[in-house]
Amino acid sequence: MASKSKLSRTRNIGVVAHIDAGKTTVTERILFYTGKSYKMGEVHDGEAVMDWMPQEQERGITITSAVTTCSWQNHEIHIIDTPGHVDFTMEVERSLRVLDGAVVVFCAVGGVEPQSETVWHQADKYHVPKVAFINKMDRVGADFFSAVRMMSERFNSKPLPIQIPWGREENFNGVVDLIRQKLLTWDPSTLGLSYEFSEIPLDVKPQVERYREEMLEMLAELDDTFAEKYLEGSLLSEKDIMETIRKTTLSLKIVPVMCGSALRNKGVQPILDAVVSYLPSPEDVPPMKGINPLTKAEEIRISSNQEPLAALAFKIMQDEGRKMTYLRIYSGQLKTGQEIYNASKGKKEKIARLLKMHANKRERVLQAFAGEIIAVMGLKETATGDTICDEDHPILLEPIEFYEPVISQAIEAKTPADQEKLSLALDKLMEEDPTIKVKYEDETAQTVISGMGELHLEIIIDRLLREFNTHVNVGKPRVVYRETIQKKVDIERLFEKELGEKKHFGHVRLTLEPWERGNGVEFIRQIDGTVIPEEYFGAIEEGIHEAALSGCLSGYPLVDIRVRLIGGSYREGEASVLAYKIAAGSAFKDGCAKAEPIQLEPIMDVDVITPSEFMGDVIGDIHARRGEIQAVTPKGSISEIRARVPLKALFGYSTDLRSATQGRAVFSMQFFRFDKT
């Protein structure tokens, strides 16, 4: 039986970063130093344990979030290694939804990069406490203090260096622990397994004293109890300092910052120490809140085995044709053979197997407890975002919101045999990744897949071939658009029809008006049940949302519209759910056609890092692509250019940028919003 003490010694963390910050290398070192793996897997050799998919090993990037468990200082640490590429941001989002803490990895050369900001804000969205690791201190151009300054400028939480580097670039030899006031160095002959504390060299003592004093001052500013001791001049113990760091980290006031070089096996063990010392256990996070799906009353679950079961399905994977569901258990317990209730679907299911995962390897267990992340076999109906609970104590947790795709591609099966396999394969891929959308076009007899970026689509097509042995012809990528309206209109529709022996009556009056960018379709009822009985309001809203799936210009979904139900009528004995749904959908569609509809295109946030000598050419090219410059930041011999550019204008940009800068510039992009074409 998992006890309360075990809960306090459990950590659920994610390792998140911008692509190429060294995130997976950090995770591989963690597995090696905790004894979980007996060989260091290297990303550049395609041997990283956590990057187990063939596509990950070939490209040297993480595509899917991988789960593992290891031990450190008598604590059990569940780790999710997440992707850094923007096309797979949703993998990070759904991982952070179920995690209690995060290790954010930064590159000492690049500092705060675009995807670093994205994952940081995603963690903030779910109130996830963080520790930061500034990696690659051995690289040319590495600057720990510049990276910390960038963190301070870009984020709400205050970065608190608890270490500073000893040396930099090729002379990076260790770190100084500002809490213990000791130098920490690693023995390269043991691959960094062996490390020691020693006295701080005299030449760096003044710098150490300065940064230690800054650390203590910041803690005193944020914690009154600590401030009293600090201002009185009392002797501050390591325990005093560490307890205050933990307290202010859990309250999201600070982010402890460390440094090292994971590839050179320096600085990783202190990350584990920080995870144990400063990041929360399941007991430290607020109770989970949900609603009772039957009564709509609020339900609360604290992290305890004695509470009724509450778990969230956050990931689906195919395992040799069998469905495997990843769950975060917030309360209660799970056992093999147990019957559970899917509150999202209103269906009962049965646990066939419980598995603890280590990347793509697994260990069968008979029981799982509150606070754990576990894989389950046997849940055929469960989808990502569903709540699993006890039928006698139902609870519905907040589901996971998924991003809308911005790019699509037409595919068609090469042979009739491939056609038979294609639909099944795409269904399974959509079940795994809800950001994949599939649509069949009758006119062209083509299947159109939509995703988050060109790499995302490339991976989907590669997986169709490798995992499902399905051969397809592929069209060129194309942009996914949206539609909206520009003016306010009032519209009225009456549906009256006899179907069989029953009359169907539905009558609604709606007001449609433009809404802020970045929103969907909002439904507001401005009448009460005396005009139209409340039992029909759900059908009216459903009819509007279904009609919004296909616009009146080119058939793209309608967004950024506020719909008010302002009137209508009711006829006793003839009113029906179907009639009100049809009337509302028809009114919405006709209203949009009269409200000056326009097309919206996806706009991307683009971040270019270029040698300063090419800055003018890069900016000129962005303007030529209808882009708007947001900021230009000089960083020594290079410049960072931030811009917003239509996605349509960015096809082939990677090749053009390389040509314009002699291959010396790099860029990244992520979705901003849909806006006027």
Spans of model-derived segments:
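Structural and coupling elements of P-loop NTPases
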Residues: 1-677
